[in-house]
């Protein structure tokens, strides 16, 4: 699979935004600190996310970013697509020139797998990820490391409607 750090970081940053947006806009500096992603890289990613209408920016004191739709309406595949990332597993990146301009024997197998991966990620929303207990555990750990920063309002599983 050719999913690089660009796609992984975009999904991580969007999940962080979804988890911390209940108190208003989230700054990229806060996401950078919590997730260990450079601020300049986040700025590049969020420019693409904004152009694709996944986030909106709020200027001024207390500004930052917000999801442009509910977290239940944003699919992981959309985030990956927005930053021009691919989940293509073919060697030829979907072109039919696998080898010397010809299709290789397994080309269609890898194309089918790429399609299945994209479909799988299209079926997972940010709300689905927020609701996962392993994500909740990691958020609590990150918040403790940050000195309590912005704890989530519920100790257990968070329903998407609690944050939206």
Swiss-Prot record:
Single GO MF descriptor: DNA-binding transcription factor activity
Keywords: DNA-binding
Domain of life of the source: Bacteria
Keyword Ribosomal protein attached: no
Gene Ontology CC annotation, any one: cytosol
Secretion signal, residue range per the UniProt entry: none
HTH rrf2-type domain ranges (all copies): 2-131
Gene3D superfamilies, alphabetized: Winged helix-like DNA-binding domain superfamily/Winged helix DNA-binding domain (1.10.10.10)
InterPro entries recorded: TF_HTH_IscR, TR_Rrf2-type_CS, Tscrpt_reg_Rrf2, WH-like_DNA-bd_sf, WH_DNA-bd_sf
A Pfam family recorded for this sequence: Rrf2
Name the UniProt record assigns to this protein: Putative HTH-type transcriptional regulator ORF2
Species in which this protein is naturally found: Azotobacter vinelandii
């Amino acid at each position: 699979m050719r999913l690089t750090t660009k796609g992984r970081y975009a999904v991580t940053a969007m999940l962080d935004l979804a988890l911390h947006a209940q108190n208003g806009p989230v700054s990229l500096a806060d996401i950078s600190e919590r997730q260990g992603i450079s601020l300049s890289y986040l700025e590049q990613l969020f420019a693409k996310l904004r152009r694709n209408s996944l986030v909106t920016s709020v200027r001024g004191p207390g500004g930052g970013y917000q999801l442009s739709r509910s977290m239940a309406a944003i699919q992981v595949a959309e985030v990956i697509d927005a930053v021009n990332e691919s989940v293509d597993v073919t060697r030829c990146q979907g072109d039919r020139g696998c080898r010397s301009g010809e299709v290789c024997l397994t080309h269609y197998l890898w194309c089918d797998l790429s399609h299945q991966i994209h479909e799988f990620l299209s079926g997972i929303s940010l709300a689905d990820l927020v609701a996962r207990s392993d994500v909740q555990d990691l958020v609590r750990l990150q918040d403790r490391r940050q000195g309590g920063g912005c704890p989530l309002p519920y100790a257990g599983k968070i329903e998407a409607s609690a944050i939206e």
